[in-house]
């Protein structure tokens, strides 16, 4: 995806909260993972309910009388600051690791708890490599328990239910709160915090077209990638039996759509037909020219059919039989001079639209976070939520604007840089130092175009685009450097080097065979 990919998305699950310590995680977890294993997940995403805090005379937050008192998360130290981070994607995890890396006065080093509904951190820009077979799941989706083994960061696998912030009490001259507030989790846990970080991510927006929610495959999470891989494998087995071409429809020609089309067309080769649909008459409308041109060359060489200037009106089953897995997509022209048409597909991949998981439910109230129309928290330039000096927001949860007044894109590159500033500004706030305003540095954009192909347009050399195997190697190196923790980077680096050596030997053997056979 462009500039790395969008930040972490949370998928509902039925597990209760689990506190993972280093010893427990080592004893009970392994790093193995089967890509073909079934994931039972729903597409209904978690909602963040903002409820009115009931404050008594002493300034503490209480639960409403008609609710059962939740269990309180026990912090190890009652004196040191308490930092609760919601969301374990690029924004949340890297903020936690940044806090861990800073030098603290002994009595001020914060206790950090990270809450996420998944047991794994997902490096989303490389989900495409799961479809091409370039990477293993453990390489791009390590367990939090493994990543946090040698840190003081605690991990809770749970779902956020309610926020009860009380730092708004210190705004506009009112009494200053002695605590930041409380987070209620779906399992019944209550976390009292001094500082809160909102990094809840987003989910695919499938409810804009009839049939998309029920029939289309999003490509946004690890679970999505596994489902798509399983579906493609099923279609490949069917193709092997009857020789029928595999018809793939990709909705959207942004970075995600183009990367998917390039990866799948390479995987299927002459066994499949890939059609990419886009409302604009161009692909990658916001990308550098070099990336767009490189992508067009690859898509053309792999015979990807581009249906540009079309809107998807609806998605329907090809028949009323559940076992019939074909679909019809009704396309309406978004540009003059085009005619409506209906195309058929064996699988529909949806890559357009995302909605933040931070959602405001109450129209008013002193503790309601200020959200924009997209459901993102309004923040100041230090990444603090406006009106809530003890709450920071980043990634998909934040609506920070650049120097030109435009909202920053919700990419992993932005979240990665915001995490660095968020960690530092929490340090500064705890130590009574000035907070730093966030300044985004665009390092460029890169995308995968297949197993040995990619395109990179670095921002520091105008007009330069690295393509083909060189771009592919540079992209993997850049992402290797961005992986969390030195230990994980080392393990993945060794694994990728070994795979590269095996591929090189296989290629050499293939070339020698061709030479010896005279072909």
From Swiss-Prot:
Enzyme class, first EC level, given as a word: oxidoreductase
Cofactor, how bound (note): Binds 1 FAD per subunit.
Main location: mitochondrion
Activity regulation, short description: Inhibited by dicumarol.
BP GO terms, sorted: aerobic electron transport chain; cellular response to light stimulus; phylloquinone biosynthetic process
Consequence of gene loss (knockout): No visible phenotype. Increased photosensitivity to high light.
UniProt-annotated binding residues for NAD(+): 246-282
Record-listed E.C. numbers: 1.6.5.9, 1.6.5.12
Tissues in which the protein is found: Flowers, roots, leaves and stems.
Cell location: Mitochondrion; Mitochondrion inner membrane; Plastid, Chloroplast; Plastid, Chloroplast, Plastoglobule
Range of the transit peptide: 1-52
Cofactor: FAD
GO cellular component: chloroplast; mitochondrial inner membrane; mitochondrion; plastoglobule
Molecular function per GO: NAD(P)H dehydrogenase (quinone) activity; NADH:ubiquinone reductase (non-electrogenic) activity; oxidoreductase activity
Record field: catalytic activity: a quinone + NADH + H(+) = a quinol + NAD(+); a ubiquinone + NADH + H(+) = a ubiquinol + NAD(+); demethylphylloquinone + NADPH + H(+) = demethylphylloquinol + NADP(+)
UniProt keyword annotations, A-Z: Chloroplast, FAD, Flavoprotein, Membrane, Mitochondrion, Mitochondrion inner membrane, NAD, NADP, Oxidoreductase, Plastid, Transit peptide
Role, per record: Bifunctional oxidoreductase ables to act both on prenyl naphthoquinones and on prenyl benzoquinones. May serve a respiratory function. Involved in an electron flow toward the plastoglobule plastoquinone pool. Required for plastochromanol-8 accumulation and for phylloquinone (vitamin K1) production. Probably not directly involved in cyclic or chlororespiratory electron flows under standard growth conditions, but participates in the redox metabolism of plastoquinone-9 and the tocophrol recycling-intermediate alpha-tocopherol quinone.
Family label: Belongs to the NADH dehydrogenase family.
Protein name: Alternative NAD(P)H-ubiquinone oxidoreductase C1, chloroplastic/mitochondrial
Organism: Arabidopsis thaliana (Mouse-ear cress)
């Amino acid at each position: 995806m462009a500039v790395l990919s969008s930040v972490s998305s949370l998928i509902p699950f039925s597990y209760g909260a689990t506190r993972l310590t280093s010893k427990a995680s080592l004893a009970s977890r392994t790093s193995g993972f089967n890509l073909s294993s079934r994931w039972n997940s729903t597409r209904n995403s978690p909602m963040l309910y903002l409820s009115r805090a009931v404050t008594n005379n002493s300034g503490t937050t209480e639960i409403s009388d008609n609710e059962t008192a939740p269990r309180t998360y026990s912090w190890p130290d009652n004196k040191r600051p308490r930092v609760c981070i919601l969301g374990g994607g690029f924004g949340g995890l890297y903020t936690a690791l940044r806090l861990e890396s800073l030098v603290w006065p002994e009595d001020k080093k914060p206790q950090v708890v990270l809450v996420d509904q998944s047991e794994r951190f997902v490096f989303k820009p490389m989900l495409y490599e799961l479809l091409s077979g370039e990477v293993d799941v453990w390489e791009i989706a390590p367990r939090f328990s493994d990543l946090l083994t040698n840190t003081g960061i605690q991990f809770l696998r749970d779902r956020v239910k309610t926020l009860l912030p009380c730092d708004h009490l210190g705004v506009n001259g009112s009494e200053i709160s002695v605590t930041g507030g409380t987070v209620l989790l779906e399992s019944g846990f209550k976390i009292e915090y001094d500082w809160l970080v909102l990094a809840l991510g987003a989910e695919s927006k499938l409810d804009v077209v009839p049939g998309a929610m029920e029939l289309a495959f999003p490509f946004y999470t690890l679970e999505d990638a596994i489902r798509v891989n399983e579906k493609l494998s099923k279609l490949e087995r069917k193709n092997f039996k009857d020789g029928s071409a595999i018809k793939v429809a990709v909705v959207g020609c942004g970075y995600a759509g183009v990367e998917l089309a390039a990866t799948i067309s390479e995987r299927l080769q002459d066994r499949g037909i890939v059609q990419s649909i886009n409302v604009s008459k161009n692909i990658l409308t916001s990308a550098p020219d070099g990336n767009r041109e490189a992508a067009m060359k690859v898509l053309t060489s792999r015979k990807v059919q581009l249906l540009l200037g079309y809107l998807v009106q609806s998605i329907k089953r090809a028949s009323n039989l559940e076992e019939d897995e074909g679909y019809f997509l009704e396309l309406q022209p978004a540009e003059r001079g085009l005619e409506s048409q209906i195309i058929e597909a064996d699988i529909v991949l949806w890559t357009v639209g995302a909605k933040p998981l931070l959602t405001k439910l109450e129209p008013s109230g002193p503790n309601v976070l200020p959200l924009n129309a997209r459901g993102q928290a309004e923040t100041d330039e230090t990444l603090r939520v406006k009106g809530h000096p003890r709450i920071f927001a980043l990634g998909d949860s934040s609506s920070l604007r650049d120097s030109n007044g435009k909202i920053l894109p919700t990419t992993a590159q932005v979240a990665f840089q915001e995490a660095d500033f968020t960690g530092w500004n929490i340090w500064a706030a705890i130590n009574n130092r000035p907070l730093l305003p966030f300044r985004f540095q665009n390092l460029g954009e890169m995308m995968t175009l297949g197993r040995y192909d990619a395109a990179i347009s670095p921002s520091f050399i105008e007009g330069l685009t690295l393509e083909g195997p060189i771009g592919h190697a540079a992209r993997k190196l850049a992402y290797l450097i961005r992986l969390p923790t030195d230990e994980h980077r080392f393990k993945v680096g060794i694994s990728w080097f070994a795979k590269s050596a095996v591929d090189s030997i296989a290629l050499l053997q293939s070339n020698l065979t061709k030479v010896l056979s005279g072909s």
